[in-house]
Curated annotation (Swiss-Prot):
Keywords: Adaptive immunity, Cell membrane, Disulfide bond, Glycoprotein, Immunity, Immunoglobulin domain, Membrane, Receptor, Signal, T cell receptor. Residues 1-21 form the signal peptide. Alpha-beta TR is a heterodimer composed of an alpha and beta chain; disulfide-linked. The alpha-beta TR is associated with the transmembrane signaling CD3 coreceptor proteins to form the TR-CD3 (TcR or TCR). The assembly of alpha-beta TR heterodimers with CD3 occurs in the endoplasmic reticulum where a single alpha-beta TR heterodimer associates with one CD3D-CD3E heterodimer, one CD3G-CD3E heterodimer and one CD247 homodimer forming a stable octameric structure. CD3D-CD3E and CD3G-CD3E heterodimers preferentially associate with TR alpha and TR beta chains, respectively. GO terms for biological process: adaptive immune response; response to bacterium. It comes from Homo sapiens. This is T cell receptor alpha variable 17. InterPro entries: Ig-like_dom, Ig-like_dom_sf, Ig-like_fold, Ig_V-set, TCR_alpha_variable. It comes from the Eukaryota. Gene3D superfamilies: Immunoglobulins. One of its GO terms (cellular component) is T cell receptor complex. Residues 22-112 form the Ig-like domain. Disulfide bonds join 43-109. It is found in: Cell membrane.
Length: 112
């Protein structure tokens, strides 16, 4: 009898939420990685902000808040998540360490 061994694949989708009519850029639009690898997603914004928040959304479900970083913070951690904020470049990154199949979702950033 043959045993079939497969590699689990985690697909993370990043989309940028446009808040207050800001035009943003997303990078990457789709990310495909192996389970256990780290995933980094980026978002950029055009105007000054007070806070930046990251959300995730599973297919057919509502948004789930992940983490908030204030404009005076550079880095913040929560479990396997790490978010960085560079206000001089108007950009933020979300790092998910040791990705799992359950991390498959659309990811959004929003500013206020």
């Amino acid at each position: 009898m043959e045993t079939l061994l497969g590699v689990s694949l985690v697909i993370l989708w990043l989309q940028l939420a446009r808040v207050n009519s800001q035009q943003g850029e997303e990078d990457p639009q789709a990310l495909s990685i192996q389970e256990g690898e780290n995933a980094t997603m980026n978002c950029s914004y055009k105007t000054s902000i007070n806070n930046l928040q990251w959300y995730r959304q599973n297919s057919g479900r509502g948004l789930v808040h992940l983490i908030l970083i204030r404009s005076n913070e550079r880095e913040k951690h929560s479990g396997r998540l790490r978010v960085t904020l560079d206000t001089s470049k108007k950009s933020s990154s979300l790092l998910i360490t040791a990705s799992r199949a359950a991390d498959t979702a659309s990811y959004f950033c929003a500013t206020d």
